[in-house]
Amino acid sequence: MIRLGIDLGNGYTKFGGMKFASKTKVGRLAGLAGLGNKPEEMHEVAYQGATYIVGDGEPFTAPDRYFTGVDYELCLLTAIGLSSKEISIDCEICVGLPIIPYMSETRALLEKKLNELTKKDKAKITINGQDKLIRIKRAIVFAEGAYVMDTMETDNIITIDLGAGTVNVTQWNNLTPVAYDTVPKSFNKLYREIANHIKNTGRGTVTPAYIEDNFGATEIDIDGKLVDISDTRQMIAKYVSSLVSNVYDICDVPQAKKIQIFGGGAVATADYWKNAFGEEREGIEVLPNSQFTNSEIYQKVIERVK
């Protein structure tokens, strides 16, 4: 049996050091039919009589995304299937919720849905042509952004978990959340705004996904030419500054010994955070390997359960 922490976020599904975009669409991958190569982070998945591409298509970011449609379940089972070479997989999993939904009835509803999966026979899913039989034997829901539960630091600490769809801001004291909120500010929206700005200023057309891949760059390639986009750094600075204002509204910042920042956009925005909080502010930490922080926390949570 395997134990697996899965961070099924608005942007990416992360697990065991692997990831794919939290997107799905009905279709087939040409690479599996011998037409070119299969993209590493896209997977052809057959489930419940339909064939999907997981890792491409449309994101599912609505507040009820855990309960409507097949998308959440599809990404969850795909992550489990990819995590093991075995055909028949028994597993225990830990998944996350943003801090505000976690503190609400959403947690109980998600736990109920996941526990319903544990009562079913093994789910059959075919990933990139390989059949998998998956039985979820236990499912735990944990809070996103709870890095202190990994380090077990008892100091007064603020954690800022930067997601593609939301930002979790939590102040901890003695491992207890004393102030928290889920801020509806989206890196996905920022990527779209930067792409639109480049288009509207006559420099060419790029996708938000391309901006994400080159986030923070001062030059990017458009139509075979290097194009200066250094002015977009001001957009990033304003975004970070606005989030810092949210942090001050939510938390007692002067009391915090550390401010720990992680998530998909953390490393690329490290300097912006230090500038926004002020160069004199000590204790600001941008965590390495930030995109996988939550999945690593969930992994430790499920491994500790007896």
Feature roles, as predicted:
Residues Q171:
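A translation/RNA-centric and nucleic-acid-associated enzymatic feature enriched
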